[in-house]
UniProtKB/Swiss-Prot annotation:
Keywords of the record: Ribonucleoprotein, Ribosomal protein, RNA-binding, rRNA-binding, tRNA-binding
Similarity remark: Belongs to the universal ribosomal protein uS7 family.
Function in brief: One of the primary rRNA binding proteins, it binds directly to 16S rRNA where it nucleates assembly of the head domain of the 30S subunit. Is located at the subunit interface close to the decoding center, probably blocks exit of the E-site tRNA.
Record-annotated disulphide pairs: none
Descriptive protein name: Small ribosomal subunit protein uS7
Length: 157
């Protein structure tokens, strides 16, 4: 266990167009090789496409709802007890919940074949908004794993 103080959380400024810290964190996750202006362009264009497909007046609220639908509530953590490793279901912390949802959305958007990141991201956000698609399947699989290993819940730490 480290004797040093805990690392301070870095405060991220809100994005310039929508004024949302969550959206700025999402842009940072989309960003590759430090190219933030490209990441911003991709995310903003994807949000416009997403808003048109969903028919939402407030883009930010629709984005937040799509993100909320993708957030996992439970996950499994490996715990070694007496030579055996158990998959112990635990609740996901709020920060990690956001982080996982964003990572999954971006991962599956990049995996869409023959489409630009802009189109893939918009499609994945629409799927999350409608509670379907690869991201929601990943969330359900995570919940299913936690449910299947409920017997080991008493090993929580």
């Amino acid at each position: 266990m480290s004797r040093r103080h805990a690392a301070e959380k870095k405060i991220i400024p809100a994005d310039p167009i929508y004024g949302s810290v969550t959206l700025e964190r999402f842009i940072n996750k989309v960003m590759m090789h430090g190219k933030k202006s490209i990441a911003r362009k991709i995310v903003y264009n994807a949000l416009e496409r997403f808003a048109k497909k969903v028919g939402a007046e407030n883009v930010l609220e629709a984005f937040e709802e799509a993100l909320e639908n993708a957030k996992p509530l439970l996950e499994v953590r490996s715990r070694r007890v007496g030579g055996a490793t158990y998959q112990v279901p635990v609740e996901v912390a709020a920060g990690r919940r956001d982080c996982l949802a964003m990572q999954w959305i971006i991962k599956f958007a990049r995996a869409k074949p023959g489409k630009s990141m802009e189109v893939g991201l918009a499609t994945e956000l629409v799927d999350c908004f409608n509670k379907q698609g690869a991201t929601i399947k990943k969330r359900e699989d995570t919940h299913r794993m936690a449910e299947a290993n409920k017997a080991f819940a008493h090993y929580k730490w």
